[in-house]
Amino acid sequence: MFRWLNINKCMSKIIHPYVLKPNNCIHTNWLFKFATLKNENKIFPKKNLNNNILMQNIKVADDGNAICEQLLFSKYDLPYLLKIPVSDLRLIDTGNNNHNPTILIRKDVILLRTGFISCIIRYNETWLFEGSNSVVINAKDLISKNLKKQNNNKFKNCNNDEIVESLCRKRNCTDNGKENMKQINNDEKEELNYLNIINNFYRYNKGKAYFEFLCLDICMQLSIKEYENDLEGINYKIRDIILLQRKEENNELNMLTNKLLRDMMKIKNNLQKLSNLLNALRTNIEKILNNENDMKNMYLTYLNKNPYNNLKDCSDLEILLETHLQLTDELYGQLENVEEKITHYEELMRLNLDYNRNKFILLNAKISFSTLLFSISSVVTSLFGMNLKNFVEDSNYAFIIVSIFVSVWSIIGIYVTKNINTLLKFFDRYNFR
């Protein structure tokens, strides 16, 4: 005991001068060798150890072309670097799956979350979340290509008249020149809109669209296309389940041994999530169309050049939003058709289940009737096995008569169990219980 007291006094004399003085706090590192510290990660486990996010930046250069680069940011530094409040940034964060699609209009910025793409749009740059995602990569390629084509359209529009005149002079026919001109325009439209989505915005505003509207349109198009692909995938799964069910229709126990109902419930839950996302996106577009201030504040390039918001015509933005609203309505209609197909198929599955239950009940009734009839015949035959004197065994025809009775009774029992439905109807008619 005396030894431990001396050791504690010596340790206190060594430790206190170094711990109390802030200048000599570095020398206390060697004390960790003599202390047993618990790991904080084991006590308080962190779920999200990786707080970094890969951002795709698309910036418009002075010559009009796009400068694309990927940057890795910390989520803690992202609000300060992008100058966006944390409350708004949380709504479009791809790591948070609890929020629905949103379109937020703030000062000099548009915040967009469609369910597949989350982006921050300014008048001269765009920040896309999750730069390694395939949809984001496709959006980046489309934005850069369309910016190049907008620059090339200025020279093409000047040379279109000269091309038509040269074609007319060579062929001496104005009709052929017009047809060739239509082919040139159709090729350009197909190159711009290869997403199989009707894009009226670029048809009427080719080469005149602002950068923010270009990014908004491409992100919305790609997201709607992804919604269509998900809906088609769900539709294919439903078809496969229906085909499996048709193959097993001849099996009486098919609905009780397979997992079709469980798979259908999973598909229905996924379809419900998809409908909620589409409905949220649709309501956000409608809110912007009904709010004139938000419509005017979305002209970021115009507001950057003109500080005073004197904008009167918002027709190009209305065309853009109404086009995507129409596409979401059509997609929502297709989704409702798939839901009706699922409900119809569920009703058929329930009817099949009821039919199988009735078959089991009927089988149980047949077994009970057959056991009743065979028990009666067994009672008759058991008379020969008794040790009592009943004077039946002395007769020469007794065995023949009893065997004929048992065989006839068994035939009657088989006939009754085979046509048990008529027997049950007879019991129901005369209230036999």
UniProtKB/Swiss-Prot annotation:
It is a multi-pass membrane protein. Residues 381-396 are extracellular. SUPFAM superfamilies: Magnesium transport protein CorA, transmembrane region. CDD domains: Mrs2_Mfm1p-like (cd12823). Belongs to the CorA metal ion transporter (MIT) (TC 1.A.35) family. PANTHER family: MAGNESIUM TRANSPORTER MRS2 HOMOLOG, MITOCHONDRIAL (PTHR13890:SF0), RNA SPLICING PROTEIN MRS2, MITOCHONDRIAL (PTHR13890). This is Mitochondrial inner membrane magnesium transporter MIT1. It comes from Plasmodium berghei (strain Anka).
